[in-house]
């Protein structure tokens, strides 16, 4: 019984998450995409909590950057952004792509799953990409903890 309720709530949340936030081309679309970014992607928490840390000279890890974070990265001289989340037609990706282009930041996507162990070949590819990207570089996932932490540790090996 409880598992059915949990599954129903998960489906309800997923349906809400996927019902809006996919358009930033109009004033109204940008408004709703920002609502989506703040509430569904939990960006409002990242206003107060920024998981930005240097892991090696010229290599940083962070949580999902907001447009203001990307502006700060540009001021720090960061040249590249490596997203471990992958491409999605969702608010967080639309805003990140738009602002990286606007700021002249090199945005690369090398996704790894947040819900299962990554394949070794995917990790090797990410480390190769990370080593080849113009530095300074910041890598991120949603929270800057699990995926970003794993890739950071592997990079240091």
Regions found by a protein language model. Give the residues of each.
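Cys-dependent protein tyrosine phosphatase-like superfamily
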Residues: 1-137, 151-157
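Short cysteine clusters
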Residues: 141
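Ser/Thr-glycine-rich phosphate-binding loops at phosphate-binding pockets of nucleotides
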Residues: 148
